[in-house]
A protein has these predicted regions:
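Short, flexible loop/turn elements at secondary-structure junctions
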Residues: 11-13, 26, 90-94, 125, ...
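Conserved P-loop NTP-binding catalytic core
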Residues: 43-113
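Electropositive, glycine-dotted interaction segments
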Residues: 94-218
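A general secondary-structure signal for short beta-strands and their flanking turns/coil
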Residues: 2, 15, 79-85, 114-118, ...
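Pre-Walker A-like glycine/lysine-rich segment at the N-terminus of P-loop NTPase domains
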Residues: 1-53, 57-74
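Generic marker of residues within folded, mature protein domains
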Residues: 10-12, 19, 76-78, 110-111, ...
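Beta-strand secondary-structure signal
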Residues: 6-8, 19, 85-89, 118-122
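Generic hydrophobic, aliphatic-rich segments that mediate packing or membrane embedding
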Residues: 36, 44, 82-84, 117, ...
């Protein structure tokens, strides 16, 4: 059975550092309000679904850990700039298609000498891209526009959601108020369950049937 085995977070929202282990069948996150339950789920979405990939860089204000931002403000330098690092370790069947794409011995900044399946996400300041920003940084300003967001597998290969090794369905009922929950569930299930080719075929067939239905109405 394929599943998420563990999660490692650095500098993301509420957590300066956090490690979570998951079991194979069911996991329940319990805690008080603002304890970070949603942050854990958001971290998984960020990695597997490449959340924020096309978002405006200003969103980083809300993603950086406030303690790391405060540490930078207290001692502003390129070295102390806030960053985000997330690892999702996976339990995959080695015989599964593309499984080797996620398998690696040395991965991430932790450089663990262990062979595992997984994906990592990193958001950090690009010194080459931000050449000439040193003075601004020393004044305590975070150059959000010069940050890069990267997704790579533990095999150090670029990760794209189309190669997602397992289906991941995230239903956030707090953000579905503008649409019926059932429709929201169906839309999310459709996106998560089927590959791009199947989704494209279904959308084209639906569009053709819709056009045909309107044509049959005989409207002027």
């Amino acid at each position: 059975m394929n599943y998420i085995k563990s999660l490692h977070i650095e500098g993301f929202k509420k957590f300066t550092s956090l490690d979570v282990e998951f079991n194979e069948h069911m996991n329940i996150l319990v805690g008080e309000n603002e304890a970070g339950k949603s942050t854990i789920l958001d971290a998984i979405k960020t990695v597997l679904n490449q959340q924020y990939r096309n978002a405006d860089k200003s969103i980083l204000r809300d993603l950086f850990n406030t303690q790391m931002v405060a540490a930078f403000k207290a001692e502003p330098s390129i070295r102390t700039l806030p960053r985000i690092y997330i690892e999702v370790e996976l339990a995959l069947d080695p015989q599964q298609k593309n499984a080797s794409y996620f398998y690696g011995e040395i991965y991430g900044e932790r450089k663990q000498q262990v062979e595992k399946f997984g994906i990592r996400f990193e958001c950090k300041y690009d010194e080459e891209l931000g050449t000439g920003m040193e003075q601004s940084i020393q004044e305590g300003k975070i150059p959000y526009e010069y940050y890069t967001l990267t997704w790579t597998t533990f095999a150090n290969r670029p990760y794209q959601m189309i190669k997602r090794p397992l289906n991941f369905l995230a239903i956030d009922t707090t953000s579905s108020a503008s649409a019926p929950s059932f429709n929201y569930f169906n839309r999310t299930l459709f996106t998560s369950r089927y590959d791009d080719a199947t989704k494209a075929k279904a959308k084209n067939e639906f569009r053709d049937k819709l056009i045909e239905a309107f044509d049959n109405l005989g409207l002027p």
